[in-house]
């Protein structure tokens, strides 16, 4: 075993409080710490929006406070090729992608990890709220102690090889404790607001942003029975279960997006939160990743999340060949969204996940 002072840990620093405290804790524990700021998005063309510059200045301030070396590394090309292109393709296909899962898989724990290793890193560390356990040479991904902040949902696509090189120093902490540690150490980012939204969009208007890259194709809105309900702005702007922005007036319960008919460019809508068209009994998933050393091949029961922060739901998983799985729900689920991640759990252990491809209804 290497001594701590001889163990180099490269921390992915975003300019936020979580990654700042990650660097602080590792430094206090005696590791050889280097901070790296990942520049994934070229925002030089975005008028009036340049949070990356501010974020890097915060990284500089914190790194100087901690007395650790820091660098900025540009991953714009990898990000465009691996994350953003995927993001656009999914929207074109009428789905609602989850770029965070892809960003973790391809950028933070691949491009960044490889770069860190080239700097002589033994490990990389991030401010994710997740925990790792090693048992007989196998790495287990465990939910973060703060149930409200647990981020294993976004880490479901990682491999044993990646996890063997990773540290999550915040995994055992509550968010409030992290803020307290930052305040006590007087870190420059102690009171900085948590970032929201997709990393490359920041706080901008999503519709406007998407229009820059994908031309909108307006079309009709209809009920499941084919009754005309007006016009939509472009299928890519809507997600299943969405209520806002439909512009359907009249009395009675609100209207929701139920489905997208890509061939006809029609948005299918239904009235009422519990409209039967919003519910499904199962789903097909693609790109299944099994975190354990051994791949699952026979059916089993476990828990699942179909969106971030959702309560765990009971399911039966039927793994298929070619990286697909059929996942049957114990209870019908509302507004399952193709393109999002389905993530599987046994107790607090995240065992893997995949991409929701299509929903299944028993009576359809």
UniProtKB/Swiss-Prot annotation:
Choose one Gene Ontology CC annotation of this protein and give it. Answer: cytoplasm
Q: Where in the cell is it found?
A: Cytoplasm
- CDD domains attached to this UniProt entry: MnmA_TRMU-like
Q: A Gene Ontology molecular-function term? A: tRNA-uridine 2-sulfurtransferase activity
State what this protein does.
Answer: Catalyzes the 2-thiolation of uridine at the wobble position (U34) of tRNA, leading to the formation of s(2)U34.
Q: Where is this region: Interaction with tRNA?
A: 149-151, 307-308
Any S-S bridges, and between which cysteines?
103-199
Q: What is its main location?
A: cytoplasm
Q: Which UniProt keywords apply?
A: ATP-binding, Cytoplasm, Disulfide bond, Nucleotide-binding, RNA-binding, Transferase, tRNA processing, tRNA-binding
- Its Gene Ontology biological processes? tRNA wobble position uridine thiolation
Which reaction(s) does its UniProt entry say it catalyses?
Answer: S-sulfanyl-L-cysteinyl-[protein] + uridine(34) in tRNA + AH2 + ATP = 2-thiouridine(34) in tRNA + L-cysteinyl-[protein] + A + AMP + diphosphate + H(+)
Protein name (database record): tRNA-specific 2-thiouridylase MnmA
Q: What class of enzyme is it?
A: transferase
* Annotated organism of origin: Shouchella clausii (strain KSM-K16) (Alkalihalobacillus clausii)
Q: Which PANTHER family match?
A: MITOCHONDRIAL TRNA-SPECIFIC 2-THIOURIDYLASE 1, TRNA 5-METHYLAMINOMETHYL-2-THIOURIDYLATE -METHYLTRANSFERASE
Quote the InterPro entries the UniProt record gives. MnmA-like (IPR004506), MnmA-like_C (IPR046885), MnmA-like_central (IPR046884), MnmA-like_central_sf (IPR023382), Rossmann-like_a/b/a_fold (IPR014729)
Annotated site, Interaction with tRNA, chain positions: 128, 340
Checking Pfam families in the record gives: tRNA_Me_trans, tRNA_Me_trans_C, tRNA_Me_trans_M
């Amino acid at each position: 075993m290497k001594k701590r002072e001889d163990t180099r840990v490269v921390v992915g620093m975003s300019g936020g409080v979580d990654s700042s405290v990650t660097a602080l804790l590792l430094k206090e524990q005696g590791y050889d710490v280097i901070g790296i700021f990942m520049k994934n998005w070229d925002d030089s063309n975005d008028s009036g929006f340049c949070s990356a510059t501010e974020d890097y200045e915060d990284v500089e301030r914190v790194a100087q406070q901690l007395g650790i070396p820091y660098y900025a590394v540009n991953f714009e090309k990898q990000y465009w090729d691996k994350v953003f292109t995927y993001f656009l393709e999914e929207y074109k296909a009428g789905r609602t992608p989850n770029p965070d899962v892809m960003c973790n898989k391809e950028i933070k724990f691949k491009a960044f990890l490889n770069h860190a290793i080239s700097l002589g890193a033994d490990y990389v560390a991030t401010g994710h709220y997740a925990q790792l356990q090693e048992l007989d040479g196998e790495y287990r991904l465990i939910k973060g102690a703060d149930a409200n902040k647990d981020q294993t949902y976004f880490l479901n696509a990682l491999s044993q090889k990646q996890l063997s090189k990773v540290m999550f120093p915040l995994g055992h902490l509550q968010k409030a404790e992290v803020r307290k540690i930052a305040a006590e150490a007087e870190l420059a980012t102690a009171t900085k607001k948590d970032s929201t939204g997709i990393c490359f969009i920041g706080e901008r208007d999503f519709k406007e942003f998407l229009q820059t890259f994908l031309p909108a194709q307006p079309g009709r809105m209809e009920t499941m029975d084919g009754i005309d309900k007006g016009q939509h702005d472009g299928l890519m702007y809507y997600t299943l279960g969405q209520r806002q922005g439909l512009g359907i007036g009249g009395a009675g319960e609100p209207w929701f997006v139920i489905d997208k008919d890509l061939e006809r460019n029609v948005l299918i809508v239904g009235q009422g939160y519990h409209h039967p068209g919003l519910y499904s009994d199962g789903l097909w998933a693609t790109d299944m990743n099994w975190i354990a050393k051994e791949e699952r091949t026979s059916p089993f029961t476990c828990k699942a999340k179909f969106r971030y922060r959702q309560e765990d739901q009971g399911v039966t998983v039927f793994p298929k060949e070619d990286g697909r799985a059929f996942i049957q729900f114990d209870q019908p689920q509302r507004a399952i969204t193709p393109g999002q991640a389905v993530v599987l759990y046994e107790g607090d252990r995240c065992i893997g996940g995949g991409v929701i491809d299509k929903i299944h209804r028993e009576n359809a």
